[in-house]
């Protein structure tokens, strides 16, 4: 991955998931068509109707699985902006499944993508429950 720019990373991400049968979906607007939120803050936000069962992914995408690069804007940690790890605007790469697969397959997809990119995963962590 040495010397790879963000355009190449985006392309390889979308191509990888397309080969796995995911429909590539464009980024939705930063101003969502959703009265419950002011701005788009996550990649999954544009798919809310599919997670709640109000929309049919097969009818709209021809697949239960999608991949996208979503423009996102967050203000919840605005006081942290400038510390080299917090931003207000960023693009979130995501793969989503609406009943096509679950956690085990999602983890396998992520691992295979990292492997294809030449990245090594030294360890993984799991959060088992509430901290309280």
Protein language model features and the residues they cover:
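Structured aminoacyl-transfer and RNA-binding surfaces used for tRNA recognition/handling
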Residues: 2-132
């Amino acid at each position: 991955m040495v010397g790879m720019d963000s355009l190449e990373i985006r392309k390889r991400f979308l191509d990888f998931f397309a080969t796995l049968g995911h429909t590539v979906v464009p980024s939705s607007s930063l101003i969502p068509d959703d009265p419950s939120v002011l701005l788009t803050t996550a990649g999954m936000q544009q798919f809310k109707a599919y997670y709640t069962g109000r929309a049919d992914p097969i009818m709209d995408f021809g697949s239960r699985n999608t991949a996208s690069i979503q423009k996102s804007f967050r203000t919840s940690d605005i006081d942290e902006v400038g510390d080299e790890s917090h931003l207000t605007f960023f693009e979130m790469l995501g793969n989503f499944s609406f009943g096509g697969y679950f956690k085990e397959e999602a983890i396998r997809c992520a691992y295979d993508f990292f492997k294809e990119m030449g990245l090594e995963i030294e360890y993984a962590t799991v959060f088992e429950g509430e901290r309280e």
